Amino acid sequence: MFSMDSFAMDKDAKLYEGNALFRNQPSYKVFNKSFEHVDDALYTLLNEVEPDVLRMELQETGDLFKSFNRNSALRDPRNNEVPPKPTRDLTTASSLYSFPNPLEQYSELNLKQQAACMRVLLAWQCSQPVDEQDIVVWQATEKKRYNEQQRVQKYIHDHEQGRKEVIYAPMKSLVAVYRKWYELGVKKLQQTYPNDSYMTFSGLPQLPQCRSLNAQTASIEQVELERIVGRVRLLPEVEVRHEALRTLRLRLDRYATRETRAPVQLLREEDKELELEAGNVFVLPLDSLLMLLTTGSYIDLPTEMFLSLRESPNSKHKCMEFQSPFPPRNCGWHTNSLILKLAYGAYISQPGQAKWLDFNINGAVKEVPDEPACDKSSIDLQMVYKPRAIDQQPSDIEDGNCNSALVSWTLRCKGEGDDCNDFQIFSTLSIPAVKDSSGKEPLGCHFIKLENKPDCGCEIMSKYELISAWVQLKLMRAEMGHCTRISLRDFEPMLEEKLTLISLEQQLHDYYNTSMPQLLSNLCEFLKLLDTVPAGDYLLRYSPKYKDKFLLCIVTKEATPQSFQLHQLLTESIPSDQAFLTQSSYLPISPTLCGRLHEELHLLPCAFPAKANGRSVQRRKVVVPIPEPSRQAPVRRQRLKKWSEAQTREFRRRCKVDQKKRARARKTAAANKEKIELEKIMTL
């Protein structure tokens, strides 16, 4: 039996309180919270927001999404642009371009008809035979295609005018690079020419106003390639690699502002004296010739160049020498293409990018060997090491892979009867490439054209580009040139186009109503007027105030209110694209070129997308509003004579005939009105 004392001792004993580590701790319920609770550590970690992402625009309290500012979105560090989509599926081949069709308009042709017409265009584009069945479909749908082309051209014109700033937004980077290139060119001009004051001496009419009173034709004849100096690219087939375009998109500034070596003086003084014994001599570089032929056509073309008139003391004949024009002070289509062409030329000049032929001034041709990675062995301790300065800019590195060619040709102007005038002209230009190792087959021309509306198709070439390509093919005596079309948005290749003299002349006639024989005839009349100007040094200038004239400016010793200084003219304004964006310049879409957009989307050029079920969409008829009849005084009702059955049939027949005539008249009036509106658009 237990005693009472032992029971009391057990009662006073302490109970087990657990491990001392867990004493004075909160209840387990505190740690047993759900992770959806706002005080939970996991909940706080998962819902933490970076301060760079959480901006003032997104900190407002609310359950609905109110607005989104693109400035608040994260940018791609490679190109500093906002990604259009947060994700991209690289497992499937998706198109980068899509035809802008928010109103969901569809073509009058079905899928099979559009496919047949596309096969015809692709066959013509690649100079391949065309299937007879496709030709039948092409001819049967000619009227539908023509009507739809007009509607699509008007639709794309309205689309560009409404979104012009968005479409030409990628042009900002090209404008920034062009400004740096312009500054380098202006520094060279300031070092070459003194800061003299000029004033207007006389005026000369531009080429469109230099028309002969008598009917005459002009042509380029007796073309001879006198000499080539420098390195020319050896290129059997023209192909612009995608890797090069991708590099240029990220490093355009590095390659476009690289300087080139000064061109060699190809036309010797003794050659000029020999030619002056027979008649007048004109020295016209390619850029100067194009300035005379296309001045005032676009806002981003050169407007000034130096002109020197010298009279031979022996023969009394004149040597009229034009210098290269000043760089344009406004940015646009042509300055964008110029920057990209310069950058691409500097990129392929790097070792290992292309093969080159070296042309000596004596006419010798040799292939340039590939430069090794190291000229001498690393064991040679006596080798000369020339470190490059850290602060040396890429523009200070001269590019040696450039060339200059001298071409002599005769501008022959034939009038009525046996009347004929010949002008001996020497032109200098750069050869883009040669096809053979002997250098006897030069490539006529190579353009890099930027497509401003890649979602709509391939644009037609500008008048300046067409005339430039035509002149280069003539002077090089080449059968074919080349035009590489790439997208302005992302520098993706769109089309490799072949250029021929026939196609260039046809485009000039169709799009710009320009005839090259007539333009050359106007050039003959201009050179005749230039022969009457006294000898001396002049500055030939174009001003928008005098749209039909060239201004001949001479140096003046005393400054006057009408005079201007040369250096001030070059530096008074910074090149920008404001004038280009404010003008109504527009390049229509070519209806015959099938580019990357059309091949990926199976879309006919200048056509709306076809219905997915293969059915064509009938165009709605134009509804002409019927004028309300004017109120007239009530006429006293007369008793009508009952007609016979024959008279009733004849009356109904005449009513139907009149109704059809009125319907045809309404359709004709609507078609004429639409045609007039489209002609206004095409003439912009």
Swiss-Prot record:
This is Little elongation complex subunit 2. InterPro entries: ICE2_C. Residues 69-91 are annotated as: Disordered. The keyword Signal does not apply. Component of the little elongation complex (LEC), at least composed of Ell, Eaf, Ice1 and Ice2. PANTHER family: LITTLE ELONGATION COMPLEX SUBUNIT 2. Transmembrane segments: none annotated. It is found in: Nucleus. GO terms for cellular component: super elongation complex; transcription elongation factor complex. Pfam families: NARG2_C (PF10505). It comes from Drosophila melanogaster (Fruit fly). Component of the little elongation complex (LEC), a complex required to regulate small nuclear RNA (snRNA) gene transcription by RNA polymerase II and III. Keywords: Nucleus, Transcription, Transcription regulation. Belongs to the ICE2 family.
